[in-house]
Each structure stands twice: as C-alpha cells, then as structure tokens.
Amino acid sequence: MAPFLVKSRRMTTQNPQAPTVFIVDDDAAIRFAMQALMDSVNLNHEIFSSGDEFLEKMTEQRPGCLVLDIRMPGLGGLELQEELIKRGNTLPIIFITGHGDVPMAVEAMQKGAVDFIQKPFRDQELLDRIREALATDEERREAQQHHAEVAGRLDRLTNREREVFDLVVTGKPNKVIAYELGVSQRTVEIHRARVMEKMQARSLADLVKMHMTA
C-alpha cells in the first residue's frame, strides 16, 4: 500500500504559465495511477485530493485542462465546476464518471465541460481526451489574445476614424461614406488609410473580421 501514500498535489513544472493537466480525485489509487500516466508521457500536471484544495491553489487563470472526478466528498465535481464558472475560469474540464453518473455528466457538458470519460477507461483514451482539451484551451487563449489586441487597436482610433471604420465594414464605398458623414471623399480616403494602418489590416476582409471580433 505504500505507493498510494503519495502527496495529494504534485507540481512537475516551475513555469505557472506552462500548459498543465490539473487532476482532482479523492481516490488515492486513482491519483497514483494518474500521476504515473502523466509522468510516462511527460505532461506537466498537478494533483489534488479535493475540490477545496484545488480552488485554494487556483487563484488565477492558468493554461491547461482539468480532469475532475464527478463524485467526491465535500465539494463535488459539479459544485467545483459551478464555482469555476462564477470565477470566470474557462479551464476545459474532463469529468471522470461511474456507470450511473451519465445524467450528471450530461448536465456538466451542458454547463461547458468539454468531455467526460467513464470508469474503467484505457490510458490512451484518457490521454487522447486530455490532448484534445489542451488544444481547446490553446485555441480559446489565442482567441482571447486576438480579441484583446483588436480592442487595443480600436482604442487608438480617433472618433472620426471609428465612424469611418464602422461604415467601411458595411461595404459602403468612400463616396457614400463621405456623404453620410458630411465630409469630402478625400477626407474619407485619408481616414480609411489611417484606420487600415492602426488596425494593421491588409484588406477590407481583415477589417470585417476585426469588427466581428470586437
């Protein structure tokens, strides 16, 4: 039984921004098996024995995914998911469920969990789900970063440039925009060029995409 007396939390990376697999399970045997599996494929991971312990550690948004037992004493999996939602934490969650927990897993999916896997499961099956969840998290973070960059560029536009931007993305020609704003067509052309430069857009299509992102 000695191998199961592992620390409830194990940190395998010194970089808090490295993608990490967070594992929360009250079963020591499961934690030990998960730890061995993560080590075998060199996945950064941290292991917790309870939802409360995990929340105490996760004081900020970090990249990675969460592998979470749906049934635990104290703070259960669904309750932990609810708390993360309240905190605005978008960490992708994979729920580990028993045979009779499918309705709970469906509820978790409806609330934003990316996947669930039933016990017993094959190691490769879990690893595949984890890699998919990590890819999902990376895509979300890239989208959030892009949104923040676009918002920053928009803030640098003058009021007039923003007016021109909002009209340009509707597909209206410079002549029509000039008429609607009560300025010359040449003025619109100048503002349009400045908008393209400040927004770092190479084409009208780029501007339209940024407008949709904003």
Please name every model-derived segment.
Residues M1-F22, A28, Q35, E149, ...:
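Non-catalytic signal-transmission and effector/linker regions of two-component phosphorelay proteins
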Residues S8, A193-A214:
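Basic, Lys/Arg-enriched C-terminal extension of HTH/homeodomain DNA-binding domains
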